[in-house]
Structure formats: structure tokens, C-alpha cells
Design a protein with these regions (language model features):
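Short, charged cytosolic
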Residues: 1-21
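Conserved beta-hairpin
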Residues: 75-115
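Soluble N-terminal interaction domains of secretory/endomembrane membrane proteins
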Residues: 11, 86, 184-187
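Alpha-helical transmembrane spans
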Residues: 24-90
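Short, exposed beta-strand/loop patches in secreted or surface proteins that constitute
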Residues: 8, 92, 116-120
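Acidic, Ser/Thr-rich low-complexity segments on the non-lumenal side of membrane proteins
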Residues: 102-143
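A membrane-cytosol interface segment of integral membrane proteins
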Residues: 126-187
């Protein structure tokens, strides 16, 4: 067990399930539409900003300003690919006390803070575990983001708001362990 994970486990706490995301396409059915909409909005925003800049400058245009506009507007569509690559490297763990997502950092939430959760599949058949009111309201095209950026509330007594295991490869194992460790949670 790596040192980063070992630090997150309490004395006597045991890992009862581990999983990883199953293989998925970056622009699958669930995420393709969001990518194209984001790309169209970014192109329109970049064009509008360039036109505004060129219309309001006095003297010669500064190429650096144009480059900054294009780079900033180009980041949003590229982010879909960066997030997909990052999700592929995640490890999901369930212990007898908490849920963990391990990458270059560890995100965790105590099982006692999970008040609502669901196992849901997207249009591509990828099963994801969603915990918290915000996660349950999220569209399937946002589930990858939740696995990377979903934040449990910082208050120890507050229920988790947004936590997700995206596209779990071991579907049967995840279903069984969730029923076991969260038997009283609304699913």
C-alpha cells in the first residue's frame, strides 16, 4: 500500500473493496455533445473578444493579448481530454469506515456522512457511484468532473454533497460493497 493512502487510514481500518475506472472513450455518447457545445461557445467567445479588442484599441494591436484570449478560450474544450486522462488513473477504495479516491492526492469521505447515494449508468453503460445531493442532480456528462473535483463538505457533521466513482470496472463488486457498508442509505 502506498504511503499516501496509508496516511489516510485509521488504526485497524481495513480496505474491503478497490476498483478502477473501466476503459472509456473521451468523446463517448455521454460526453460528445458537451464537448461540441463547449467548443462552439469558446469559439464564439474568442471571436467576440478578438473583435472587441480590435475595435477598441488605439494604435497597433498587441499580439500577446490576442494569444492570451485564444489560449484562455481554448482551455475549456481541451479540459475534457485532460479530465478523461486523469480519471483513467484514479483508484477507488471502500474501507469499513470511508470512501476514498486516490490519484496524486486522496479525497475521502466518512461513510457516516453519506446520506443519499445511487449507482447509475450513463448512455454508454458506464456504472458510476454518486454520493450527495449535488452529485445525484448532476447530468451524466458531469460525472467525470465529480470524480476529480467533487468535494465532500468540510464540516465533519454535514452530509457529503458531491462525491463520485466514475465508470467503475468491477460493477458487481461495487454493488455488493455499497449494499454492505451503506445498508440504511437511501439509494
Amino acid at each position: 500500500m502506498d504511503a499516501l493512502l496509508k496516511e489516510q487510514l485509521a488504526e485497524g481500518e481495513s480496505i474491503i473493496w478497490q476498483g478502477v475506472p473501466e476503459p472509456f472513450e473521451t468523446l463517448d455518447k455521454t460526453n460528445k455533445k458537451r464537448f461540441w457545445i463547449t467548443l462552439a461557445v469558446c469559439i464564439a467567445a474568442a471571436a467576440a473578444l478578438v473583435v472587441l479588442y480590435l475595435a477598441n484599441i488605439k494604435g497597433e494591436p498587441k499580439p500577446a493579448v490576442l494569444v492570451i484570449i485564444l489560449v484562455l478560450c481554448g482551455f475549456a474544450p481541451v479540459r475534457r481530454f485532460l479530465y478523461a486522462a486523469a480519471v483513467r488513473k484514479l483508484r477507488y477504495l471502500v474501507t469499513d469506515r470511508q470512501l476514498l479516491i486516490v490519484s496524486n492526492e486522496v479525497k475521502r469521505v466518512s461513510l457516516s456522512r453519506v446520506k443519499v447515494c445511487a449507482l447509475r449508468s450513463d448512455a454508454d453503460g458506464h456504472l458510476s457511484f454518486l454520493a450527495g445531493a449535488h452529485a445525484l442532480k448532476a447530468r451524466p456528462s458531469h460525472w467525470r468532473d465529480l470524480a476529480l473535483t467533487g468535494q465532500p463538505n468540510t464540516e465533519p457533521d454535514e452530509p457529503v454533497d458531491s462525491f463520485a466513482f466514475y465508470a467503475v470496472a468491477d460493477k458487481a463488486g461495487l454493488r455488493a460493497v455499497i449494499r454492505r457498508v451503506l445498508p440504511n442509505v437511501q439509494m
